C-alpha cells in the first residue's frame, strides 16, 4: 500500500505544473525540490545526479513524457500539449531568470547524459537531484531501484523562457535532440498553464 501511495505521489509531482514551489533566490533558501543556487556557487559545466538522490520511481513514465533512447523520459514538445510553467528565479551567476520545476525519469541500470547546446551554455542549466547542482550537462550513471524508472526532482533554469533543445545520449550511443517548452511553447504546443 505504501509503495502505491509513493508511486502516485511521484507521478503527480512529475506531471503537475508545480507552480507553488519557490524558485531559487538570493533572498530565500530553496524549497525542497528546488535547486540550491546562489551567486556564490556558480554552476559547473557538468553535474552528476547521485543515485541516492532519486525518489521512489514508477513502473512506466506518464503519458505526457517521451521515452528517449529507451532510457530517459522527458516532457517533450512531441507529447506534451503545453509548455512547462516557469517562475522567477536567480541564476547561478546572480542574474534574474526562470525555473521550470519538472522531474526527470531515468530507466534503472542505464547511463544517461543530458546537455544543452554550447550556444545555450551560461544561459540554460539542468538541475536534478536533492538539492541538485546546476550544469549545462547532467549525468545519471546506472542507478538501481525497485521500480523500472527512477524519479529525480529538479528542473530547468533558464535566462530566457522558450523552446529549449535538450541533447540526450544513452549508454554512450548517438546523441538525440528533443525540444522542451520552458515557460514558453515550442511549435505545436500551447502556452504554459497559469495559476
Model-inferred region functions:
Residues 5, 19-195:
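Non-catalytic macromolecular-recognition regions in eukaryotic signaling proteins
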Residues 14-17:
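C-terminal motif of bacterial Sec signal peptides marking the signal peptidase cleavage site
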Residues 1-11:
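N-terminal export and membrane-targeting signals
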Amino acid at each position: 500500500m505504501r509503495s502505491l501511495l509513493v508511486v502516485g505521489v511521484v507521478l503527480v509531482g512529475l506531471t503537475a505544473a508545480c507552480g507553488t514551489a519557490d524558485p531559487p533566490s538570493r533572498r530565500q533558501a530553496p524549497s525542497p525540490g528546488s535547486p540550491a543556487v546562489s551567486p556564490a556557487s556558480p554552476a559547473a559545466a557538468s553535474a552528476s545526479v547521485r543515485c541516492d538522490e532519486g525518489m521512489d520511481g514508477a513502473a512506466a513514465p506518464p503519458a505526457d513524457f517521451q521515452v528517449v533512447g529507451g532510457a530517459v523520459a522527458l516532457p517533450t514538445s512531441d507529447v506534451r500539449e503545453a509548455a512547462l510553467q516557469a517562475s522567477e528565479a536567480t541564476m547561478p551567476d546572480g542574474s534574474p531568470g526562470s525555473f521550470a520545476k519538472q522531474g526527470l525519469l531515468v530507466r534503472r541500470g542505464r547511463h544517461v547524459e543530458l546537455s544543452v547546446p554550447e550556444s545555450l551554455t551560461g544561459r540554460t542549466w539542468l538541475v536534478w537531484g536533492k538539492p541538485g547542482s546546476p550544469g549545462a550537462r547532467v549525468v545519471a550513471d546506472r542507478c538501481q531501484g525497485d521500480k523500472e524508472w527512477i524519479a529525480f526532482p529538479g528542473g530547468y533554469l533558464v535566462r530566457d523562457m522558450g523552446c529549449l533543445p535538450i541533447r540526450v545520449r544513452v549508454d554512450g550511443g548517438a546523441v538525440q535532440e528533443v525540444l522542451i517548452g520552458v515557460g514558453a511553447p515550442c511549435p505545436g504546443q500551447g502556452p504554459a498553464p497559469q495559476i
